[in-house]
Regions:
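Core catalytic alpha/beta fold that binds nucleotide/phospho-ligands
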Residues: 1-251
Length: 251
């Protein structure tokens, strides 16, 4: 996870072009130069730095034959908008890692994994309450209040939004499921050194939308997101294979 304020300070202290040459593929440098809005420019750069670092960790732990410079890795996008790793300099025999990128407020976050994955970070904002009916059903609201009584409604919504976003990103369908097509069914506490203070949200496709899932046999009947609330941000990770939770790489 990268503090975008820190990134902004780094840009002010050194030549941004040099920073971009270190982290971005030439095609990505061209893309960044086209982003004129300062906030979008910073978020995009922060997301690319995060995902490159996550990829380098993944490749190192996958015994890739040589360390790959960040600038040699190129992130492209599928027609759906999903970020993908261009094979490029990667070993042709290895499975191309799956990636996911997110940013909100002052942070950017990314993950790389051997299976389809989704990551999301969401700042706790009052605007979520104004659009609550678009992503949180009454049943889900009651479930959150019942199992997380120590949190207020805005924190409930922040966690739910992040969790659903992570699941949407991890589901490999032609079109992402809608927020209300995913139903929160269960909340579990996660204990242990790998999940300090974490929560496990279990989702299922809403009744009547199961047909969307029948197009592929690679997805489980349920989806789980590891969720936490940290300094006013909801952070969520979904992997298509929950057994991979100990082995993912994020930055």
């Amino acid at each position: 996870m990268l503090d975008l304020d820190h990134l902004r300070a780094c840009i002010l202290q050194r030549d941004e072009a040099a920073l971009c040459r270190e982290w971005l593929h030439p095609v990505e440098q061209e893309k960044l130069s086209s982003l004129r809005h300062q906030k979008r420019h910073l978020e995009w750069l922060g997301g690319r730095i995060c995902v490159k670092e996550a990829l380098r960790c993944f490749l190192k732990n996958s015994r890739h034959p040589a360390e790959v410079p960040a600038a040699h890795l190129q992130i492209i996008h599928a027609a759906s908008g999903r970020p993908l790793v261009h094979q490029g300099v990667l070993n042709g025999d290895m499975v191309i890692p799956h990636i996911s990128i997110s940013h909100s407020g002052k942070y950017a976050l990314a993950v790389a994994a051997a299976a389809p994955c989704g990551v999301d970070i969401q700042e706790n904002r009052e605007t979520l309450g104004r659009v609550q009916e678009r992503f949180c059903s009454q049943v889900e609201g009651r479930l959150l209040m019942r199992f997380l009584p120590g949190l207020d409604s805005s924190e409930h919504l922040t966690l739910l939004w992040a969790a659903k976003e992570s699941v949407k990103k991890a589901v490999l369908l032609e079109s992402m499921p809608g927020f209300l097509e995913l139903e929160l069914r269960r909340i579990d506490l996660r204990h242990g050194p790998d999940h300090p203070g974490g929560l496990l949200f279990t989702f299922a496709f809403a009744l009547g939308n199961q047909g969307k899932l029948s197009a592929t046999t690679t997805h489980p009947a349920q989806f789980q997101a590891l969720v936490c609330l940290d300094h006013g941000y909801g952070i969520a990770l979904c992997l298509s294979s929950p057994s991979l939770f100990p082995g993912f790489h994020y930055a």
